[in-house]
Amino acid sequence: MRKTSLLNSNISSVISKMGHTDMLAIGDCGLPIPKETERIDLALIKGVPGFIETLKAILEELQVEEVLIAKETEKVSPELFTKIKEIIKDTKITFISHEELKKELKDCKAVVRTGEQTPYANIILKSGVVF
């Protein structure tokens, strides 16, 4: 059994294959996922699992150098945005429109779908290097 906290084999598999600047998205339960992008569906019921707990778990395993967030998030869901900033600390944030974020999903290695129902609870994580 794995010693790290992330137990989901599909997420671990995607992360293990990611290189520098590859992208992985985490989305709320309403985020449209392109057919060509791998979907890792964790949604069980409304709110479970949550976006924040999923983000925390993935960040324990993935080195991230930049995050892409819809600029609408800060205004529409300020509490969520504050929590994201606390978690990612000094990681670079690039703001794009929600429509642009949805287009970027086509270039992601996968989208992790949560049960989150907070508006704009979506993020794209750009992989960094550990050296």
From Swiss-Prot:
It is an enzyme of class 5 (isomerase). The active site is at 20 (proton donor). It is found in: Cytoplasm. It catalyses: beta-D-ribopyranose = beta-D-ribofuranose. Substrate binds at residues 28, 98, 120-122. GO terms for biological process: D-ribose catabolic process. The keyword Cytoplasm applies. One of its GO terms (molecular function) is intramolecular lyase activity. Keywords: Carbohydrate metabolism, Cytoplasm, Isomerase. Homodecamer. HAMAP family: D_rib_pyranase. Belongs to the RbsD / FucU family. RbsD subfamily. This is D-ribose pyranase. It comes from Clostridium perfringens (strain SM101 / Type A). The lineage of its organism: Bacteria, Bacillati, Bacillota, Clostridia, Eubacteriales.
